[in-house]
Amino acid sequence: MTIAVGRAPQRGWFDILDDWLKRDRFVFVGWSGILLFPTAYLAIGGWLTGTTFVTSWYTHGIASSYLEGCNFLTAAVSTPADAMGHSLLLLWGPEAQGDFVRWCQLGGLWAFVALHGAFALIGFMLRQFEIARLVGIRPYNAIAFSGPIAVFVSVFLMYPLGQSSWFFAPSFGVAAIFRFLLFLQGFHNWTLNPFHMMGVAGILGGALLCAIHGATVENTLFEDGEQANTFKAFEPTQEEETYSMVTANRFWSQIFGIAFSNKRWLHFFMLFVPVMGLWTSSIGIIGLALNLRAYDFVSQEIRAAEDPEFETFYTKNILLNEGLRAWMAPADQPHENFVFPEEVLPRGNAL
């Protein structure tokens, strides 16, 4: 009698590493974690370091750190000096030559945070793809997260790449982002851009859908518990529905005359609206990077210039944009030494 004993298959280093990365632990690592965790750690650490210690005196002529007296709303990691162009500003590059202090003064931390932040966001999206595949569900979470990634990449990377340097990107700070919004309005008339309009419709529409959906579900919960708190009547593993889709459909049919009767369409619509808003606004920002114009009603501008009594909300906004450009440019770009004589500063038609 012959007994054959099978030899266990050889496990290579890749299989061992794959098992370790995908092990069930409190914080899942996975292959995406190799990209996500180091880049997110460095991006957040760089931002905390910059807002705490690093000045923007050499790049923007302003104070931007807690050390200089800023608070959480006014501190920022500022963009590099305009003279740096689109350099990656590597610490060991020709600009800083390994000098960490000089690297910080030139704005190297901004490039560091922006690039590591972009890769961290991509790593987080890949993490959602990876876990969805392991759990056996569809990857719509990752697809939805492509919206914020598109906005980050278009605003912080694509826009300054279309301009003369990284200097014109937003700095990483609350007040700094507000300044960038004013800049986009003054120099690009961004609020009148159709892609901005689609973005606003998507984001605010998504918020409205979220509020309506949450309220409707709360309105139509089944009375399936004796407790005073209705939340205690729900069990995550229960098989039966927790709210009545039929009742919700009847309610909104009476309100609007039309309502979703399919939960799958309803939730896809709630996914589609805000994500499309993010995507379209990202496309618009790329248009601004190329200095494309949208909705310039020149005929109204010409008539307003010829007729002091003719003015529209559009022409008033154009004057405001001129004011933003004239008063913002000297303060925002001190290295250019802009000086505007009084006669070229914008004045209303009635003045």
From Swiss-Prot:
List of residues binding a plastoquinone: H213, F260
Entry keywords, A to Z = Chlorophyll, Chromophore, Electron transport, Iron, Magnesium, Membrane, Metal-binding, Oxidoreductase, Photosynthesis, Photosystem II, Thylakoid, Transmembrane, Transmembrane helix, Transport
Positions with a binding annotation for chlorophyll a ChlzD2: H116
Q: Name one GO molecular function term.
A: iron ion binding
Tell me where in or outside the cell this protein is found.
Answer: Cellular thylakoid membrane
Q: Which Gene Ontology cellular component terms are annotated?
A: photosystem II; plasma membrane-derived thylakoid membrane
- PROSITE patterns tied to this protein: REACTION_CENTER
Entry cofactor note text?
The D1/D2 heterodimer binds P680, chlorophylls that are the primary electron donor of PSII, and subsequent electron acceptors. It shares a non-heme iron and each subunit binds pheophytin, quinone, additional chlorophylls, carotenoids and lipids. There is also a Cl(-1) ion associated with D1 and D2, which is required for oxygen evolution. The PSII complex binds additional chlorophylls, carotenoids and specific lipids.
Query: What EC number is given for this enzyme?
Result: 1.10.3.9
The residues that hold chlorophyll a PD2 are H196
Residues annotated as binding pheophytin a are Q128, N141
The record's catalysed reaction(s) read: 2 a plastoquinone + 4 hnu + 2 H2O = 2 a plastoquinol + O2
Q: What does this protein do?
A: Photosystem II (PSII) is a light-driven water:plastoquinone oxidoreductase that uses light energy to abstract electrons from H(2)O, generating O(2) and a proton gradient subsequently used for ATP formation. It consists of a core antenna complex that captures photons, and an electron transfer chain that converts photonic excitation into a charge separation. The D1/D2 (PsbA/PsbD) reaction center heterodimer binds P680, the primary electron donor of PSII as well as several subsequent electron acceptors. D2 is needed for assembly of a stable PSII complex.
Oligomer and partners: PSII is composed of 1 copy each of membrane proteins PsbA, PsbB, PsbC, PsbD, PsbE, PsbF, PsbH, PsbI, PsbJ, PsbK, PsbL, PsbM, PsbT, PsbX, PsbY, PsbZ, Psb30/Ycf12, peripheral proteins PsbO, CyanoQ (PsbQ), PsbU, PsbV and a large number of cofactors. It forms dimeric complexes.
**Similarity comment text for this entry:** Belongs to the reaction center PufL/M/PsbA/D family.
Q: Which PANTHER family match?
A: PHOTOSYSTEM II D2 PROTEIN (PTHR33149:SF12), PHOTOSYSTEM II PROTEIN D1 (PTHR33149)
How is this protein named in the record? Answer: Photosystem II D2 protein
